[in-house]
């Protein structure tokens, strides 16, 4: 049992991060503190001063832990990382949270690749972005591909390496085939340098040079060549124009404001570049009615800019935010020059911030209207389902199960959950089949259902024994209806498992036609046809598609992992860490097999003996 009095007594008077957990060991809140002992103790004192949300959270705290840091800045960075990792229930959650795309140039390779990624890392490569307009980044990439025949493969290609056969892209003029040795590193890098200059938007010499070439071609009556150069100039100018919207310069600004109703809120960001509003983003934030605006905006800024590579010089907000000095310091370190957070009192900037707030209100109203509309449609479908099955109440929580394997190999089971007609991803569960050998879907289904309800009963008993407030654990909430993707056989398996545990839950299955399309439901040994295109059929299709997707995705990930690791596990001197480093560097077994000694030695953790072991294994 966690000793709160003792743990509160020994809290250090240092900066750090505290992690609150519920009775099931789940992280429900992550916070930072300038002085840990002062901040954490506040939660367990003077509850009258706490908001309703904080009081609800404190009731669910079964234990806490903390991590001491050297500074408040380190605590802020760690807090951001842990919130992203755990998505705790009581932290502010951005409903439309997203990682913006970047254009990445792998400049640490001899023959770099250029592609779109949503993962920004300090790995020595060049990143351009983030692009808040997802369409624009792919338009830019499309233009780059037209202009520059670069490689798109993940091969580890080094200058002077063993040449391989050129792929189809070479034969259709989309790649210069560095893999086959048809282009030198210096020639290839001329294209890369040109792309970097275009994306930077700082070098106009390329266009000047091309215009001279175009004029020369026209003078020599090479009109086809001149037309191609003209098209190239237009494409480069178009890229440069699009880049202006996403390149943060010295005078660029972001405007952030928040609108809340009686429960939820919407944070709106306007991006101002060269004095013009070039883009905007909005994020829905749930259950913040009791939270002070300064706290919400502070948390929002830390989360929003924590995942982006570029930060404007000035951020305008409606009022001073919590930990403003610390947040400014955090953003300044990320940007590499001073960042200011300001509150405009009058003039154009105040007017623009008012516009941001008005737009936040509009977006929140639209979001709520859409939610109401979806809620009505889902309620109608659930009402129809309850009527069809003769249930006493609406099946608010539906659990669906599926099995995925290839001839019994890497057999997995998955459970997806729909609450009030909407997918509830946080409650999805997946199972590796342990007791069944070979392709036996019925027994595999029996295993995962037995494990699911066994865990559920254990959790319920634990909560009751400790007299704790009922908490949303991994399995303790039981469904109102179980929907089996299969027919009568799977339904009977589910009913047998429930009977063994003494649980009464209605179970239905899905009936397919000769084209394997769902045509109805089987319930109590009776087949019930469902009208195609009805709200109920649309709901069933959503559930069915989701459980299939989740099962296949999990099965594929296990299969790929097994395939990649099985060969490397047989190589002497190659442990788990080295296997991981090899796969991160080369991407595939085939690339590792083809790698030279120099390439292998360039891999973190691979010494001469390990490299020799790899070469010997693949040559034998």
Curated annotation (Swiss-Prot):
Residues covered by the UVR domain: 204-239
CDD domains tied to this protein: GIY-YIG_UvrC_Cho
UniProt-recorded Gene Ontology molecular function terms: DNA binding; excinuclease ABC activity
GO terms under cellular component: cytoplasm; excinuclease repair complex
Keywords per UniProt: Cytoplasm, DNA damage, DNA excision, DNA repair, Excision nuclease, SOS response
Coiled coil residues, start to end: none
Database matches in SUPFAM superfamilies: C-terminal UvrC-binding domain of UvrB (SSF46600), GIY-YIG endonuclease (SSF82771), RuvA domain 2-like (SSF47781)
GO biological process, one term: SOS response
Subcellular location field: Cytoplasm
Residue stretches making up the GIY-YIG domain: 13-92
Keyword DNA damage assigned: yes
Pfam family membership, one: GIY-YIG
HAMAP family, per database record: UvrC
Subunit structure: Interacts with UvrB in an incision complex.
Family, per entry: Belongs to the UvrC family.
Function: The UvrABC repair system catalyzes the recognition and processing of DNA lesions. UvrC both incises the 5' and 3' sides of the lesion. The N-terminal half is responsible for the 3' incision and the C-terminal half is responsible for the 5' incision.
The protein's name: UvrABC system protein C
Organism: Clostridium perfringens (strain ATCC 13124 / DSM 756 / JCM 1290 / NCIMB 6125 / NCTC 8237 / Type A)
């Amino acid at each position: 049992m966690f000793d709160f009095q003792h743990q509160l007594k020994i809290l250090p008077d240092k900066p750090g991060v505290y992690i609150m957990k519920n009775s099931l060991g789940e992280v429900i809140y992550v916070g930072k503190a300038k002085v840990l002992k002062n901040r954490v103790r506040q939660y367990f004192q003077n509850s009258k001063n706490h908001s309703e949300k904080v009081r609800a959270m404190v009731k669910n705290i079964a234990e806490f832990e903390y991590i001491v840091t050297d500074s408040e800045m380190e605590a802020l960075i760690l807090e951001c990382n842990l919130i992203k990792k755990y998505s705790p229930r009581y932290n502010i959650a951005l409903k439309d949270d997203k990682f913006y795309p970047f254009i990445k140039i792998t400049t640490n390779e001899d023959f770099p690749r250029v592609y779109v990624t949503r993962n920004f890392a300090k790995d020595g490569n060049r990143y351009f972005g983030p692009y808040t307009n997802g369409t624009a980044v792919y338009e830019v990439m499309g233009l780059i591909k037209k202009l520059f025949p670069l490689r798109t493969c993940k091969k580890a290609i080094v200058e002077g390496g063993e040449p391989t056969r050129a792929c189809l892209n070479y034969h259709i003029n989309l790649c210069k085939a560095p893999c086959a040795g048809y282009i030198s590193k210096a020639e290839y890098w001329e294209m890369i340098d040109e792309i970097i200059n275009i994306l930077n938007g700082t070098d106009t010499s390329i266009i000047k040079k091309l215009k001279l070439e175009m004029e020369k071609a026209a003078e020599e009556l090479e009109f086809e060549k001149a037309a191609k150069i003209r098209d190239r100039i237009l494409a480069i100018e178009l890229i440069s124009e699009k880049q202006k919207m996403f390149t943060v310069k010295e005078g660029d600004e972001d405007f952030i404001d928040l609108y809340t109703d009686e429960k939820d809120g919407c944070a709106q960001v306007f991006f101002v570049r060269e004095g013009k509003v070039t883009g905007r983003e909005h994020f829905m934030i749930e259950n913040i009615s009791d939270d002070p605006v300064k706290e919400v905006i502070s948390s929002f800024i830390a989360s929003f800019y924590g995942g982006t590579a570029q930060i404007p010089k000035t951020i305008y907000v409606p009022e001073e935010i919590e930990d403003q000095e610390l947040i400014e310091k955090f953003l300044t370190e990320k940007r590499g020059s001073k960042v200011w957070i300001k509150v405009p009192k009058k003039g154009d900037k105040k007017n623009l911030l008012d516009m941001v707030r008005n737009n936040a209100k509009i977006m929140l109203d639209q979001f709520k209207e859409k939610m109401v509309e979806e809620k009505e449609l889902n309620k109608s479908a659930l009402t129809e389902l309850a009527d069809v099955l003769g249930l006493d109440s609406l099946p608010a929580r539906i659990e669906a199960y599926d099995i995925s394997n290839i001839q019994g190999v890497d057999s997995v089971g998955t459970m997806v959950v729909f609450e009030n007609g909407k997918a509830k991803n946080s409650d999805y569960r997946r199972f590796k089949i342990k007791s069944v050998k070979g392709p036996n879907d019925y027994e595999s289904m029996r295993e995962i259902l037995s494990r699911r309800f066994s865990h559920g009963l254990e959790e319920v008993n634990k909560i009751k024994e400790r007299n704790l407030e009922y908490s949303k654990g991994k399995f303790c909430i039981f469904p109102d209806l179980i929907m089996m993707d299969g027919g009568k056989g799977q339904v009977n398996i589910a009913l047998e498992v429930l009977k063994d545990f003494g649980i009464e839950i209605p179970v239905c299955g899905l009936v397919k036609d000769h084209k394997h399309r769902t045509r109805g439901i089987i319930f109590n040994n009776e087949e019930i046809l469902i009208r195609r295109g009805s709200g109920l059929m649309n709901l069933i299709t959503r559930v069915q598609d989701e459980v299939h997707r989740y099962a296949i995705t999990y099965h594929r990930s296990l299969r790929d992992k097994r395939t990649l690791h099985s060969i490397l596990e047989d190589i002497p001197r190659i442990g788990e860490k080295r296997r991981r480093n090899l796969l991160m560097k080369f991407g595939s077994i085939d690339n590792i097999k083809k790698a030279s000694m120099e390439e292998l030695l360039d891999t973190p953790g691979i010494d001469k003996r390990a490299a020799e072991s790899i070469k010997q294994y693949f040559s034998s």
